[in-house]
Amino acid sequence: MSRVEEIRRVAIEHHHRVASRFEAEYAALENSRFSSAFTYGRAKIDKMVDELFRSLPRGAAILDVGCGTGEHLKRALRQGLKAAGVEPAPAMLEVARRNVPQARIEDGVATRLPFGDKEFDAVILIEVLRYLDRPDIVLALREAHRVLRPGGKLFVTLVNRWSLDGFYLHQRARQLLKRSSFNPTNPYCLFHTPGSAKRLLERTGFTNVRTEGRLLGPIRILYKVDAGLGRSLARVLEPFDDWLHRASWTRRFAGHLIAIGEMPKG
């Protein structure tokens, strides 16, 4: 098995193991976005996903690649869209099919989508590309390009290299101690900057690419120090958090990096 395949395998097995945790986190999110660092960060992403869905005409077709427990498929259906998903982790797939029986959800991987050319008006990859090595990321983006219609939209999240939560430095320290860029017992993580994310999408054929930042990184640290402290300060800091990441120079320090591109219309 090649390094790229091993990284992909570990990611799938990890998400198979944590399916019940994801389901519980999303249940908590329905009650309060401040429940955990996970729910707070996902609420930021979900707000942008909802904006994307609202920009589409009723009946438009969306594909959620790595759909997990199916939460974004439910959001799409509530907006009057046609929703399809693909998920390789067996436990995640089972939960998604149970949660969203009205959506078409296939067993498959981002690098080989089980759909025809030009089937969708939008493709989203939420916290998927971060777990793949570079060759698989390129393949996944090419597959998204293939299944999108002219003028279709792509929405992906990536891990910001210089996020103020210090995750990149933490990962680098672990790699140096283990003298390896990949530990087969833990999921891989590939970091990007706004500039590298923009170039990545442009090189795979997307146009009008823009990047956004969401989530003040230190809020994650506060949750880890003390969950109650994290919840309290997240409520206080949220207005500042949202304002801060509207500025172009601050997005490189955000906890979540989002890249949005379009298919050429011609």
What are these regions (language model features)?
Residues 138-150:
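A short glycine-rich, Lys/Arg-flanked "PGG" loop and its adjoining helix->strand segment in the class I
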Residues 69-112:
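Class I SAM-dependent methyltransferase SAM/SAH-binding core
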Residues 2-57, 59-66, 155-177:
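Conserved class I S-adenosyl-L-methionine
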